[in-house]
Regions:
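Intrinsically disordered terminal and processing segments
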Residues: 1-71, 75-135
């Protein structure tokens, strides 16, 4: 009977160690993905935009990353951001970061503070708008 208990305890220990190893590996993978996305977002093109130099019209911009594919139509009227329409939004943080559009329009600036909890998506939106009206 004592031998059965010992075998049972060894089985539980092995299972717990295996679960701990799986959790550590999953955590490492998650952290590595976050770092890769941060590196990718920080390498996006960001153009210094003077809205006073931008002619009235509609401009399309597209930014593709491994975590978010974004396509926007930016309307400039009287050197102000009049509207930013989302044409394509597919990926992580796309919907969560969408309120940054209203911030840009309200402040009439391309570079505005990121949406809390959707910082990487916010960077993609900023890059997409700056690319649209700069090129």
């Amino acid at each position: 009977m004592a031998e059965k208990k010992r075998i049972y305890k060894n089985d539980i220990s092995s299972v717990l160690m295996l679960l701990a190893l799986i959790c550590l590996m999953a955590g490492g993978w998650y952290i590595a993905r976050k770092k890769a996305r941060l590196r990718e977002a920080s390498s996006l093109p960001f153009y210094k935009v003077e809205l006073s130099q931008i002619a009235d019209g509609e401009y399309e911009g597209q930014t593709m990353t491994s975590f978010l594919h974004l396509k926007l139509k930016v309307t400039v009227e009287n050197h102000q951001l009049k509207d930013i329409e989302v044409l394509e939004n597919d990926g992580i943080d796309g919907e969560t970061a969408k309120p940054i559009i209203q911030k840009m329009i309200d402040e009439n600036k391309v570079v505005v503070p990121a949406i809390k909890g959707a910082e990487l998506g916010s960077l993609v939106y900023i890059s997409c708008v700056s690319t649209a009206i700069s090129l």
